[in-house]
Amino acid sequence: MAQPAVAWFEVTGKDGPKLQKFYSDLFNWQVQDAGDGSGYGLVQAAPKGIGGGIGPAQDGGPGAVTFYVEVDNPADYLAKAEKLGGKTIVPPTEIPNFGLTFAFFADPEGHVVGLSKGAVQ
């Protein structure tokens, strides 16, 4: 099995459009609407780097900065994280229209990390 790599980043918060403008102005990132009505914006990967997303927090909370590690089986990695002292936050969740499955776990100190399988752009 290949070593899993960081494949995606996400910045969410109370004001998704304001965050999109901030990061667009700061880094000259082109943020494209995801097209699903969520207010989420997609950032294409630069020649050196990874793509990501910026938008509103789903629960209306303060948001977070998260990175996602691309893996072949999110459920297996959640189980492994739990054996190592982590905790599952969100079980594997499929987003069919994006061909993506994601999950979240917290490490032993509470840092939340995303897992992804599929079409991370």
Where are these regions (language model features)?
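Conserved short beta-strand elements that form part of the metal-binding/catalytic scaffold
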Residues: 29-63, 112-117
